[in-house]
């Protein structure tokens, strides 16, 4: 990975990130964070890997005939026509297990670009490496060790561990502020990979990388699952956004690249993507009717949409008050839906009300007084009914 075809899509994704950021901020991004999952890169033959390389200004060299990647080639600045962007990857545990050669390829690319004798304003990787390695030398590391440590850009879980820790934290309500979410994200994800180093815990270095990010990215190559149907999206990408917000003190620009249609690759902001899925799926009557055909599981999945929306809001501020109001209206207040939920899965209805009330309690949603009162009524009513059922069975 990546294949020549994936390289072309990766270049398009990279160009769109840069163009979008310039249109919003008026300058090039110096540092970009990208989430790399194994399944997506297997399906797309390495599109996200290609984007990582392209942002650095490095292209793969392919073996004639087999098209296997056999090396790397620096794209000259005259050809690139832009600065080399510094890229940090948060890899999944499965990516670590299934793509060790790709991790080493990306690590080599960073080291290659860092060694180039180029103007620092044309090579942000070198700019950051020079500054960070000097700091590490001042802390007592040798020049060689300081350079190596400053150059780590591939981070993930320690060996044998999977996940980002964020979903469990939010589900358990075990947090008070964005700083708590960031702390968990760093603790789980600050294990560096590259060369002979396989999972060295470097929280200070990972925090520095997160605190420098101008942009965060997670790309999608299909619509089978999305950021509201699974909590993994928020755990990895939302967690990264939360880390930047906490450490840097301001939110990054955050994008979702969509390459489901290879002829029309598009780049949405996280907020735009959340609203797109919210309108087209979550509150779409056809979607709700479809879920109602699946009984207990359909009800549980609907509750998950509310939960994942709330979790995204906690990390990335993607929800607006009207969206929470719509969830309350369409999922919990609608007589037909409410009756069905009470029949097939009252626990899901109780969870929906509980999450919506938590969003209000945490200040993520300024609920209308009548909406809040109705949600409290539903929660207590279902709780009473479930207690009666429990008493009958005991």
Task: Enumerate the predicted regions with their spans.
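Ligand/cofactor-recognition surfaces for anionic moieties
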Residues: 1-394
């Amino acid at each position: 990975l990546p294949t020549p075809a994936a390289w072309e899509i990766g270049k398009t994704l990279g160009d769109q990130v840069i163009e979008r950021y310039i249109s919003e901020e008026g300058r090039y991004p110096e540092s970009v964070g990208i989430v790399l999952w194994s399944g997506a890169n297997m399906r797309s033959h390495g599109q996200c890997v290609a984007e990582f390389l392209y942002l650095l200004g490095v292209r793969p060299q392919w073996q004639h005939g087999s098209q296997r990647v056999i090396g790397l080639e620096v794209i000259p600045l005259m050809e690139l026509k832009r600065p080399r962007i510094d890229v940090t990857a948060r890899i999944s545990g499965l990516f670590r297990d299934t793509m060790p050669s790709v991790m080493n390829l990306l690590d080599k690319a960073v080291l290659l670009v860092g060694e180039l004798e180029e103007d620092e304003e044309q090579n942000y990787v070198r700019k950051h490496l020079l500054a960070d390695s000097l700091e590490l030398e001042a802390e007592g590391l040798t020049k060689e060790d300081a350079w190596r440590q400053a150059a780590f850009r591939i981070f993930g879980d320690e060996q044998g561990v999977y996940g980002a820790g964020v979903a469990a934290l939010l589900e358990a309500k075990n947090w008070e502020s964005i700083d708590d979410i960031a702390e968990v994200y760093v603790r789980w994800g600050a294990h560096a990979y590259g060369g002979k180093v396989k999972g060295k815990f470097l929280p200070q270095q990972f925090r520095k990388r997160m605190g420098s990010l101008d942009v965060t990215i997670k790309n999608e190559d299909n619509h089978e699952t999305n950021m509201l149907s699974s909590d993994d999206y928020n755990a990895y990408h939302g967690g990264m956004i939360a880390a930047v917000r906490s450490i840097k003190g301001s939110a990054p620009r955050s994008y979702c690249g969509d390459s489901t249609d290879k002829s029309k690759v598009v780049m949405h902001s996280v907020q735009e993507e959340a609203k797109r899925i919210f309108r087209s799926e979550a509150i779409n009557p056809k979607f709700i009717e479809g879920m109602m055909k699946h009984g207990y599981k359909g009800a549980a999945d609907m509750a998950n949409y509310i939960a994942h929306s709330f979790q995204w809001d906690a990390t990335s501020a993607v929800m607006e008050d009207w969206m929470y109001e719509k969830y309350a209206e369409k999922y919990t207040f609608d007589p037909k839906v409410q009756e069905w939920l009470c029949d097939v899965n009252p626990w899901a209805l109780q969870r929906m009300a509980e999450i919506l009330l938590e969003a209000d309690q945490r200040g993520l949603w300024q609920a209308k007084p009548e909406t809040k009162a109705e949600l409290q009524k539903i929660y207590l009513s279902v709780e009473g009914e479930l207690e009666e059922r429990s008493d009958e069975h005991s």
